[in-house]
């Protein structure tokens, strides 16, 4: 994985501390081209990996990229699924059949039959496969080396003890999409232990890691213990800036001290901030001591 990854919160008015800033972002990025312009800036700065939700507008961005395939041939997406709001809105506007037609590839009657039988039988692995295929439809023809399961699902399944679905997810992603499975969680230590117990080897785990403990379940000390341990996992640090509560230098100095952290995910929309964060991550990671 690349050391530096750009996230998408800034494009879809997600700010965990400021509603005012969220509204400003919504206005700025109301046009798809404005998002692509920022991705172009990131590429100019040397960032070629974009970790994003499966928001409908991502499909529009991909459509724009496909008009210039040579330019984006080395660009990588890390899809994060599911995007729950998308399905809730579609059910309201299109109904059940309309939602299936819109998001699930293949013959609608065959898919509906498969989904119906799976639901009646409580065949959750089959339902999961259908939803994965629906979410991945927009990424056809693009580079997707890692495909993530969102924390809203990961942490729910962990809480319910539905461990077998993690194994099925990992196997399906590898087999169907020739990609590595990734897991986003607000409880990194528990996720590491669960993957170890289930035999999911050297998992990619994306979790909030910052010096304030922002959106980190468990103590900072426990996270640090795992990040300096011999446990086999590949952590991606997100929420490093604690939604803007920390300055970049201070935030990245903390995160980048850990040698085990393979990638750092951040959101920014100006050339200056993108370049600043990239330079900090690369420079400070080279000096990692723990």
Which residues fall in each region the model found?
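Active-site mouth loops of central-metabolism enzymes
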Residues: 16-33, 111-131, 159, 241-246
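A short, structured active-site edge motif that brings together acidic residues
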Residues: 75-88
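Well-ordered, non-membrane alpha-helical segments in soluble/globular domains
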Residues: 27-38, 55-64, 125-135, 161-171, ...
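Beta/alpha (TIM)-barrel catalytic core signal, keyed to glycine-rich beta->alpha loops juxtaposed to Asp/Glu
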Residues: 136, 140-145, 152-290
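N-terminal small/glycine-rich loop or linker at the start of catalytic domains
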Residues: 1-26, 89-120
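Short amphipathic alpha-helices and their capping/turn segments at secondary-structure boundaries
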Residues: 1-3, 62-71, 130-142, 192-197
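Active-site gating/metal-coordination segments in enzymes
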Residues: 98-154
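N-terminal binding-site loop/beta-alpha segment at the start of enzyme catalytic domains
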Residues: 1-72, 254
